[in-house]
Amino acid sequence: MIFEKKTLLGLDIGSQSIKLVDLAKVRGGYELKSLGLGLIPAECIVDKDIMDSETVVDTIKNLRENLKLRARGTASAISGHSVIVKKAELPLMSQAELQQTLMIEAEQYIPFDINDVYLDSFILGESLERSDMMDVLFVASKKELVDDYSSAIRNAGLKPMLMDIDVFALETMYEVNYPDAPESVVALVDVGASMININVLKDGMSIFARDISMGGRQLTER
């Protein structure tokens, strides 16, 4: 979900800490200009839902002030039980045609009331099994989750300009850092404090994406 296009700060709202990063694009890659991390109590974020917005907002504000950042636009990502990623096989059509029938096509794959979610779709390509069909990726998130994160960002004095899904943000990071990686099967795994994000790529395309409600905190407590 893209709100507008400008220079962005990276904002990661995790269940144990909040990270804010400022990168500059330079020849040959990116340069780290600023990086900040603020710890938050475990009860602030539960199953990726914001339970204590005041603490989250104050932590983001403090990070921005301590780093003396002038930019306000942010890119962030969400995951958890309120986010659904489904692969479907549909008759061949253009992206424009798919957008026109998006709500109808997605309703059978999304286990939420279709009116309660923000929805997007991506055509992955022609089906390997049938030439008259195509593979489509449906991505949906409950509006409440996106709106809660967006509100926290705005209340901290920043502007939510891009909201991604954690597994696909992980994929983008991989593509940026390893542009010349050979096309094969690659498993991207991000182990957070309370969530594990997995994205399996084959020939540069996501074939399996999953969030697991378990992370480093549970492993440490054992």
Predicted regions and their residues:
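Oxyanion-binding/catalytic loops of NTP- or PPi-dependent enzymes
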Residues: 35-45, 128, 175-222
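Structured core elements
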Residues: 10-12, 19, 75-77, 137, ...
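Short flexible coil/turn linkers enriched for glycine and charged/polar residues
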Residues: 2-5, 14-17, 70, 80-82, ...
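Non-catalytic, solvent-exposed interaction/assembly segments
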Residues: 1-105, 147-149, 157-159, 184
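Short, ordered loop/turn segments at secondary-structure junctions
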Residues: 25, 165-168, 212
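Conserved active-site and cofactor/substrate-binding residues in soluble primary-metabolism enzymes
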Residues: 51, 55, 144, 214, ...
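Active-site neighborhood for divalent-cation/phosphate handling
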Residues: 77-177
